[in-house]
């Protein structure tokens, strides 16, 4: 049966958890901030169509598209189980800017693999599918990591564990927080953002990082939103990556003065997130970011909430 899966935007790192924390977000106004993938029966083993507002940024060659790679690894896994892959046609609706720090590649990967799995009657379980998603993310960024694909697929705030067969688990967070997401419209490559980081860190930074991350997780589990927000600090990446983001320091300064609880870089940037407790504060911060952080017509600002669902079926037609 034909299926369409939507996969939401995500915040890698959430400042405090470099490479081990991620959060899925969705705009409060119902805008779909994420990619959709449709899978339906086809005449050939595989064919791909593309659509969406950022379709022009995709490779023109089918075999260079990550959705094709998803089909290849999904077929490989089904072959191991003695299951044949159906002839199918996939359509990627690319609604997410590439190199934005919003988990754009994760959106395509999660929507594609989830849709393929559902189209075939879900032969792969959640952990098997998530492992494939991490493998595909690694193909793009150069190393397997789950801090975008896990929240995008499973929803909420996810902590990467990768032990005892557990890839990630959800961290209880605060449903009343507003997450203002501001994408300036420029591109920052994940590879460049990683190269700028030091190969070694000072002991006091390592201690501070451990305190902040442990404190954040503890505050989430014990229901202390003010403490959790105070712990959202990054000594690992943001001090070095700020120089790649024009206007970030000013934006954080304004957001703090306007009443935001915390502001940080989403993933490797250039998108920033700002957490606010009150909607009027979130809207004030959003207006300022639209006027001062967004640099061109491709940029945007959304007031979001945590997306607790992750990837979902939205029907059978795009």
Swiss-Prot record:
Binding residue positions for ATP: 97-107
Source species taxonomy: Bacteria, Pseudomonadati, Pseudomonadota, Gammaproteobacteria, Vibrionales
NCBIfam families attached to this UniProt entry: PRK01212.1-4, thrB
Gene3D superfamilies named in the record: 3.30.230.10, GHMP kinase, C-terminal domain
GO biological process: threonine biosynthetic process
GO molecular function: ATP binding; homoserine kinase activity
Family of the protein in this entry: Belongs to the GHMP kinase family. Homoserine kinase subfamily.
Reaction it catalyzes: L-homoserine + ATP = O-phospho-L-homoserine + ADP + H(+)
Keywords of this entry: Amino-acid biosynthesis, ATP-binding, Cytoplasm, Kinase, Nucleotide-binding, Threonine biosynthesis, Transferase
Pfam families: GHMP_kinases_C (PF08544), GHMP_kinases_N (PF00288)
Gene Ontology cellular component list: cytoplasm
Biological or metabolic pathway of the protein: Amino-acid biosynthesis; L-threonine biosynthesis; L-threonine from L-aspartate: step 4/5
Cellular compartments annotated: Cytoplasm
Source domain of life: Bacteria
EC number: 2.7.1.39
Summary of the function given for this chain in its UniProt record: Catalyzes the ATP-dependent phosphorylation of L-homoserine to L-homoserine phosphate.
Gene label: thrB
Top-level EC class as recorded in UniProt: transferase
PANTHER family named among the record's database cross-references: HOMOSERINE KINASE, HOMOSERINE/4-DIPHOSPHOCYTIDYL-2-C-METHYL-D-ERYTHRITOL KINASE
Name of the protein: Homoserine kinase
């Amino acid at each position: 049966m034909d299926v369409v899966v939507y996969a939401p935007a995500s915040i890698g790192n959430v400042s405090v958890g470099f490479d081990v924390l991620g959060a899925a977000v969705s705009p409060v106004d119902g805008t779909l901030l994420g990619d959709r993938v449709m899978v339906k029966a086809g005449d050939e083993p595989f064919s791909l169509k593309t659509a969406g507002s950022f379709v022009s940024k995709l490779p023109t060659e089918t075999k260079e598209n990550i959705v094709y790679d998803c089909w290849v690894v999904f077929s490989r896994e089904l072959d191991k189980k003695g299951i044949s892959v159906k002839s199918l046609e996939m359509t990627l609706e690319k609604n997410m800017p590439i190199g934005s720090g919003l988990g754009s590649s994760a959106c395509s990967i999660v929507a594609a693999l989830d849709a393929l799995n559902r189209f075939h009657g879900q032969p792969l379980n959640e952990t098997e599918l998530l492992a494939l998603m991490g493998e595909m993310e690694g193909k793009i960024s150069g190393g397997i990591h789950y801090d975008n694909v896990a929240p995008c697929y499973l929803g909420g705030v996810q902590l990467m564990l990768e032990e005892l067969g557990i890839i990630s688990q959800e961290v209880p967070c605060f449903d009343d927080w507003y997450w203002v997401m501001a994408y300036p419209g420029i591109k920052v490559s994940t590879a460049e953002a990683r190269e700028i980081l030091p190969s070694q860190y000072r002991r006091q930074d390592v201690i501070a990082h451990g305190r902040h991350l442990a404190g954040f997780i503890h505050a989430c589990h014990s229901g202390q939103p003010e403490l959790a927000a105070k712990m959202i600090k990054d000594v690992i990446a943001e001090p070095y990556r700020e120089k790649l983001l024009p206007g970030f320091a000013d934006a954080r300064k304004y957001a703090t003065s306007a009443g935001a609880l915390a502001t940080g870089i989403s993933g490797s940037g250039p998108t920033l997130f700002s957490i606010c407790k009150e909607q009027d504060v979130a809207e004030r911060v959003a207006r300022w970011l639209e006027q001062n952080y967004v640099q061109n017509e491709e940029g945007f600002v959304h007031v979001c909430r945590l997306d607790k669902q992750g990837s979902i079926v939205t029907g059978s037609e795009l």
